[in-house]
Amino acid sequence: HIDFLEETIGHIPETISCRYNPGGVFELSNGIMDNPGDSKYGMTKDQLIEAFKILKDKGAKHFGVHAFLASNTVTNEYYPKLAGELFELIVELKEKTGCDIRFVNLSGGVGIPYTPDKEPNDIAVIGEGVHKKFDEILVPAGLGDVSIYTEMGRFMLGPYGCLVTKAIHEKHIYKEYIGVDACAANLMRPAIYGAYHHITVLGKENAPCDHVYDVTGSLCENCDKFAVDRMLPKIDIGDYLAIHDAGAHGFSMGYNYNGKLRSAEPVSYTHLRAHETRSNLV
């Protein structure tokens, strides 16, 4: 799509990054994490080499490489393994194209544990693993000045936001349903990915989880469910439910389909210290 880029913006930027897709499956010690070969994104290695040569001839001076091989991996192995693959790739790109490679973007994000039984990633261990690969691969190749970028939105924000919603309906047919006043317009992940988000019934944190519910929104789509066959305390109309780990991919992925209006976003914070005034010095 180099011609398309050139036609769209009128030139080739001096700094440009290309996305790599290694194909196949991406595996770690705990099994297959994702299947890049099925992804519509990125270039093969041969395409990437050719693209760098063409872009260089068209005036690009500084290059970056990006890859996204798995999403929300709750393991400290992902980033070091991804870094190793990309570092080896840019050494080869440098040798075969002579391009000035300035940065690498390790994508996919440091994952967060959406289920209570999982341990969180250790960011220090991840950093040490990436640093080790950097020293082993890039430094000996004369690429010790390459910058590393990454994407930490979910890691920084995900665990620190909740979607608070009110139980407004109940239905007893072939399953037990609790309808709430939020819907997929407020949090899409369960509807589009089948993703798990932990749910707490506020005020009933210590009550036995002895009821099986589907917790649903009000969209005219059967996938609009925050929980399916979830063991929860008995929920009464008017109870408030906290849907956890909604600080990322929440409001930003929201929409107005079905005439839905997105919720407010209150922020809770504490002043640790007031700013100083001149009177503090007197």
Predicted features along the sequence, with ranges:
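Active-site-proximal beta-alpha core segment in soluble small-molecule metabolic enzymes
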Residues: 1-103, 112, 133
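Charged (often Lys/Glu-rich) extended helix/loop segments that serve as interaction or gating elements
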Residues: 138, 143-273
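Short acidic, glycine/serine/threonine-rich loops at helix termini
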Residues: 7-8, 26-33, 76-79, 115-119, ...
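Single conserved hydrophobic/aromatic residue that forms the stacking wall/gate
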Residues: 271-274, 278-282
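Short, structured patches in soluble enzyme cores that scaffold and shape functional sites
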Residues: 20-22, 66-69, 108, 152, ...
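Short glycine/threonine-rich loop-to-helix capping motif typified by GTGT followed
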Residues: 75-82, 113-126, 157-169, 228-231
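Acidic/histidine-enriched ion/cofactor-binding microenvironments in catalytic or ligand-binding pockets
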Residues: 14, 99-102, 121, 125-128, ...
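Flexible glycine/acidic-rich beta-alpha junction loops that bind and position SAM and/or redox cofactors
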Residues: 24-28, 102-118, 149-160, 187-188, ...
